[in-house]
């Protein structure tokens, strides 16, 4: 389910998702499990006659959780059965004509995660920070 509000210079979108995996021992799902999550995405676009023409500042806040327990044989749908996570991402973007450059900064935190199934070289770190730089041509 998605809803978008658009009133320049703002675009705000929210969504909710739900998934379900039924019990199926043939694939190792000895208990049914599901995920549910949601996000809010907000984007501010600077006007062409502003001091920052071509600049957009998107921000995304997300949450997802899974149900079930490892003891009952639930499948791992996230960071272990019954785990959850939230994240925030900022993606400043500049576009000139058909050329763009975009940076992305993201932070995620896992909650009620199973040790060894999360982040880092041993899978035991409950948080992760990432950065990325992208540039390209739109066609």
Q: What do the PLM-derived regions correspond to, one by one?
A:
Residues 1-139:
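Outer-membrane beta-barrel pore domains
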């Amino acid at each position: 389910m998605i809803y978008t509000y658009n009133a320049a210079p703002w675009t705000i979108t929210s969504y909710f998702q739900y998934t379900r995996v039924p019990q199926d021992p043939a694939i190792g799902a000895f208990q049914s499990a599901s995920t549910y999550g949601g996000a809010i995405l907000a984007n501010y676009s600077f006007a062409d006659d502003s001091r920052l023409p071509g600049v957009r500042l998107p921000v995304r806040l997300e949450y997802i959780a899974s149900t079930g327990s490892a003891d009952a044989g639930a499948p791992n749908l996230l960071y272990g059965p019954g785990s959850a996570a939230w994240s925030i991402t900022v993606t400043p973007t500049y576009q000139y004509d058909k050329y763009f450059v975009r940076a992305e900064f993201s932070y995620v935190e896992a909650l009620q995660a199973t040790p060894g199934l999360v982040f880092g070289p041993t899978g035991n770190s409950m948080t992760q920070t990432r950065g990325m730089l992208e540039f390209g041509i739109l066609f």
